[in-house]
Amino acid sequence: MPNSTTVMEFLLMRFSDVWTLQILHSASFFMLYLVTLMGNILIVTVTTCDSSLHMPMYFFLRNLSILDACYISVTVPTSCVNSLLDSTTISKAGCVAQVFLVVFFVYVELLFLTIMAHDRYVAVCQPLHYPVIVNSRICIQMTLASLLSGLVYAGMHTGSTFQLPFCRSNVIHQFFCDIPSLLKLSCSDTFSNEVMIVVSALGVGGGCFIFIIRSYIHIFSTVLGFPRGADRTKAFSTCIPHILVVSVFLSSCSSVYLRPPAIPAATQDLILSGFYSIMPPLFNPIIYSLRNKQIKVAIKKIMKRIFYSENV
């Protein structure tokens, strides 16, 4: 039987063993992190300060931006610090925290994107019932339900992963802890864990994806029935950013499972993990800022207010 000594720390992979490349990785990741953080903070500020954006759609957009800022903060700053300090170690407790938080934020973000699709569906297809179906009380209830179910979901997967013995190695082929990489280190049978991941991912991810697609089929069939003009343009301007955000999020997550044989597994893991941990939080505020007219107007108003107060 393999030696099943308790692993108290793990070793994460470097992007490079060359010191100058480690510095380059740290600097580039830190810049992307700052841009992402500022973009999401801007969305939160705009949707909070502008009273014209105090609507359910922007309530969920604000929550999504807070979530994105937290999500990228779980992995990227630690990776930057490790590169600067030339360190690859992470404690078992730190690894548990990373796994739990990554699973939690990904799960809740998927639910938020689904709720936002439902919000657009009701606004476009059932406008007369919108104030009743999507009111402030319902918004808060859906948010709390997403967060609480996320805690249960993340706790279930984190607990089932770390109850396994790790004895093959303590080297994780990622720049942060994630469940697929940890399962490869276990010396026990991980079949039940893998089945649970696949079933839950298909159940949650597949269910949300089908709901989002169904919502937008109804939305576009309704919008195309509008006469050409301001109403159709406004409907498209609020829906298209959300479709782009959903596409970036789902494509970045699904790309983790696409592994071309020409690229070594370790390199592939690092590239894909960097992609799905950075791209969705980075692009979400950019997409909403560029494609949503109300957001652009609100940003201009806040900028004018800031510059005016400075000049005074």
Swiss-Prot record:
Extracellular side: 1-23, 74-97, 159-194, 257-269
PROSITE patterns: G_PROTEIN_RECEP_F1_2 (PS50262)
Residues carrying covalently attached carbohydrate according to the record: N3
Transmembrane segments: 24-44, 53-73, 98-118, 138-158, 195-215, 236-256, 270-290
Keyword Ligase applies: no
CDD domains listed in its UniProt record: 7tmA_OR14-like
Cystine pairings recorded for this chain: C95-C187
Cellular component, GO annotation: plasma membrane
Molecular function per GO: G protein-coupled receptor activity; odorant binding; olfactory receptor activity
Cell location: Cell membrane
Function description: Odorant receptor.
Name the UniProt record assigns to this protein: Olfactory receptor 14C36
